[in-house]
Amino acid sequence: EICACLVGSEMCIRDSYKEMLNLPDDETQADMYLAAVEALRSRGFRQYEISNFARKGLYSRHNMKYWTGGEYLGFGPSASSDFAGKRFTLKRDLQEYIAGIRDGGDIMEDLQEIPMRERAGEYLMLRLRTSQGISAAEYEKLFLLPFAPLEDVLEKRRRYYQATQNDSGRWVLTPQGYLVSNDIITDLLIAQDSSHPLKRI
């Protein structure tokens, strides 16, 4: 992994966290994270995403667009977009991009149609990063996949205080759950991959 650090007025890049001196062990980092969550909560900041906190109404709308699977358009060389079920990137080379615009040519460099099951996986991975969480009805309506296998995984995690349902019945991860979110999401994706599509009514 790459770790960026400020040294004086210059930015340096370190090749690995291991090069940092006195990095706390995993257990200490977890304790520090939970302490930070509680300290921010006691001062009126809500945790609306795994690593983001804000006062009510001041959430990052830009980031929420990505985390909730919203469509977005990017403009200019190398810009990325996700629109109408397709994900695409515009040409990176400035001259090729300008020529494409000027001459009415192709300015796309990469175009992908994302399979529905992959979108469903992204829904789980991204929504569970947020305090909005995931909904059985929403999941089944959007992706025509059964939620029951996922609920089994989440119920097991509830026993360890890592997942819960909010007042709206949506499944969300707890601060303890965020600490092991990669494991939880992996279990959910495995359950999803073995499920069979629902029949259209």
Segments and roles (model prediction):
Residues 64-68, 74-155:
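Hydrophobic, secondary-structure "cap" segments at the distal end of domains
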Residues 158-168:
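A short, conserved structural fragment
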Residues 178-201:
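Short, amphipathic alpha-helical interaction segments positioned at domain boundaries
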Residues 36-40, 97, 157, 184:
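Hydrophobic alpha-helical packing residues
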Residues 15-89:
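A C-terminal junction/extension of Radical SAM enzymes
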Residues 131, 146, 153-160, 187, ...:
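Hydrophobic alpha-helical segments
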Residues 166-184:
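Accessory beta->alpha helical hairpin/"wing" motif in late/C-terminal subdomains of nucleic-acid enzymes
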Residues 1-8, 12-13:
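Single conserved hydrophobic/aromatic residue that forms the stacking wall/gate
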